[in-house]
């Protein structure tokens, strides 16, 4: 199945209500971005990072992806709140990626989690 669609994981929406994710630049959780080939199949029901169909190591890209740099959330209007991440680059990499998954490696209890965003 080809990699299709854009999703905000339903589990992430619930976890926001549980205050499980901290996006602050200072003291916030660690988020990573993993890259996937065209065989990856994610839906809104995706709950965790998986190595299945992740692209191979190349240059500075390694299994599990790269750590993102948190940017403090902001409220640009009365009805919108956003968060962002700094630019992530993988040098000397030759990769054919068709999609990505952002996930939290420190959600809730501290370390070792792989909750998808």
Report each predicted region and the residues it spans.
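Small cysteine-rich, disulfide-bonded extracellular modules of the LU/uPAR three-finger superfamily
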Residues: 1-98, 105-117
């Amino acid at each position: 199945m080809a990699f299709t669609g854009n999703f905000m994981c339903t589990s992430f929406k619930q976890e926001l209500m549980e205050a499980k994710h901290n996006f602050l630049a200072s003291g916030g959780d660690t988020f990573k971005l993993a890259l996937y080939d065209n065989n990856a199949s994610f839906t809104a029901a995706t709950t965790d990072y998986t190595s299945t169909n992740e692209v191979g190591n190349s240059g500075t890209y390694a299994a599990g992806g790269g750590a993102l740099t948190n940017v403090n959330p902001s409220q640009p209007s009365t009805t919108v709140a956003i968060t962002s991440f700094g630019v992530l680059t993988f040098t000397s990499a030759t990769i054919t990626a068709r999609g990505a998954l952002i996930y939290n490696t420190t959600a809730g209890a501290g370390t070792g989690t792989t909750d998808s965003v």
